[in-house]
């Protein structure tokens, strides 16, 4: 009897844990863009401040696409990122938009991993405010290649899925 009770508890735990993961969906965006340095100042022998913009296009795994732009500032030490912060806007194919805040710390300049959070959105996308994502970026010359992954709720998935269903 005790063995069967332990087996039942293990089975229930597996079901509980599995059901908890069902509500999360991996929302993935691929972004490509061009970097333009606006200002650059030497802060010391090995430190540099940069202000730059990125502009480009994106697609996601829900059939959406659009354009995006970001304005960022970064402090570099020996070509390594000490601190990077930026704000940007992504506009979907139906002209709905989101505003994001991105950060990246202590990594090499040409590649790294950071976080993005949706801080504002147009009316039909309000449900995704607060969505947090991890991104990876690589640069080749002034070209940026991003992949961004977010764990989203079913409600957020529904909202984002509806973008591709609306007429442009």
PLM region descriptions:
Residues 1-9:
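Bacterial N-terminal signal peptides that target proteins for export
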Residues 8-17:
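Sec-dependent N-terminal signal peptides
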Residues 24-168:
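Beta-strand-enriched cores of mature, soluble protein domains
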